[in-house]
Amino acid sequence: ILASVGEPDLSTTVFGQKIDLPIFLSPTAMQRLYHHDGDKASARAAEKFGTFYSMSTMATSSIEEIANISGGPKLFQLYIHKDQGLTDNLIDRCKSSGFKAMCLTVDTVVAGNRERDHRWGFTTPPKLTLKSLMSFAMHPMWAFNYLTNKKFELANVSHWTKKGSSIAKGVMDYINEQYDPAMSWKDAEYVAVSYTHLRAHETHEN
């Protein structure tokens, strides 16, 4: 009561970084499926409003590309890969590119049965089928932008594995082949030591 709201201040501090809004963008994979500017547009918007941009391992722009276009605070969503070298590569690149924090994702050690994806034959990048051709025809501007911009790829991992390149691959197949189902607290400890700011997932048991 009678707390002055003449000049409200929504700013807060997250991971030691002051941000202008008490919210930030969650990591979203494969944003170029929705718009040809994808991750870059999201990073610019987050910087404009003074909050964190969160990048998915499965982004369609690279860590370095985002670092070059955005001076705002950035967080990286990390998956533990079966290939430790790839996990280390992602951590090192984030540190070199000035990402302020890292979020270790632990809910994808086994891919879910996404029946809609199976039904529609969803792959990344999209492959040509009768259904997809009909969808492209109904969205001509999306199809034009997709065809006239750089090739679709999982830009953070395509240099390391062909399964992140322009070869059409089911997302669940990629997860099952690349992510480590044996991930444990030892992996979380390893990432925490490797990267100072690791966002923790807390439960009563943990």
State where each predicted segment sits:
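Alpha-helix-loop-beta-strand connector modules within alpha/beta enzyme cores
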Residues: N68-P73, K186-A188, V193-Y195
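Conserved phosphate-coordination/catalytic loops
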Residues: T57, H81, Q178-W185
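N-terminal capping/small domains of soluble enzymes
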Residues: I1-V109
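Glycine/aspartate-rich loop-and-adjacent alpha/beta segment that forms the canonical ThDP
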Residues: V110-L128
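An N-cap/entry alpha-helix motif that binds or orients negatively charged groups
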Residues: I1-Q17, P125-M183
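Conserved small/polar residues in nucleotide/adenosyl-binding loops
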Residues: T196-T203
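Glycine-rich, aromatic-flanked loop segments that form ligand/cofactor-binding clefts
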Residues: D107-A111, N149-F152
